[in-house]
């Protein structure tokens, strides 16, 4: 370990937060020697093993106090870091309609770039208003029917509030209202003041979107709205490398004393249901392990099972609506297509401006008549799945003005995935500190580690590989399975059990079930992003608030550990917080 790591940790306390994060441009200044930490790093100290300094294992940890650094697995392979840096560019910069290499934005989109939602590659920030172009706004709108928790069908699952002219965005974001409410009393009966007299406060969001905000036909009815924030993208490939069998064993162990999500777990058979394994109608993930796909483990709702078809792999498509060879359809809905095809302003604008084969409106122009344009607008915008691939390719790929040119090439997507799989977890800090060591002991003693499982060992990392990467591998004569960073047999320390739990909070997450979020690296958030907001909707402004939300209700799966935390003296509570901010 070099001195640079420790110099940067100290410098990180003093420098202004960064809002972008290119790999090596954020190196901290030399502010002096930190001999004690230098001597302790990488060695067993107190109740920490030597391995715990490396949360991502030896192949997945960076010495830098950064969320954007490449892993040693990337750096160890000749040429891969160059692909990593190119992939990083697709994350850090904004997409446009026609300007290469980041072209293809729209016709409707959630954001015009990734960095808006992941400031410095970390967790999104709490917002008081919804604006898609605000850097740090990691919120996705969750609009669903409360009777069955199903997403509404009139807008996309990740609702879009932006569109290119002349189309009207599916939702007018100017009509979205976010109001932050104060908790006046805990449903569980716990006081808003700790026994030693220190007070804490809790807030939660109420979100309203009037029906008039929807530019769809029909407009939705009987719906509720929640917010879900992005989390950090670093280290996700390490979670991808954990064997399904090891995750199943964890669920089985917890099933002995807890109720698990029946959508995932068969309590009678004491095993996962078929629905717990990921598959998609547009690829072969469902056959990755013979008769089934990889086990779901990504997103709060545990909807994704492979990083190569996970939240990030999909986001580069559905957040921007930038298509690629294995995504020849739009992120859209029939209700939006119908509304746009019936809008006189839309039709008139295309009639005036869409006749040239070089115009991005040309695919919608048809024969230039109002009737023809309306019919074509509906036909092109109503391509929401692989079933509409032929229509998409006819008008939005092979026809003018695209003329067969992909918006994102197979090579570019491969480079994006090298970056995505190659993001390192920052090394742990201050493990030689006596308070941090006491905090670790207390964290386990009061039961936090029951859900925030400290450590896992990855398997062989026999990952599923997507069609775009395979196509690029074929072009250059390589084996696709050897082209992405791998993390086999690594001892990692993410502090998650990869199980869904319920906390029964006010205005809770959509279904009530939420995957335990990894804690690794979160202690750097304020330094790197300027905020320390936590939980699925950023309702927790501090670690203490995040913990106390776990005890809002006595029904919470984490009520007992929270009650114990509540009754600890302040010095012990502070030690737990210091531990969480160090791992």
Predicted regions and their residues:
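Bacterial N-terminal signal peptides that target proteins for export
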Residues: 1-9
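C-terminal motif of bacterial Sec signal peptides marking the signal peptidase cleavage site
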Residues: 19-21
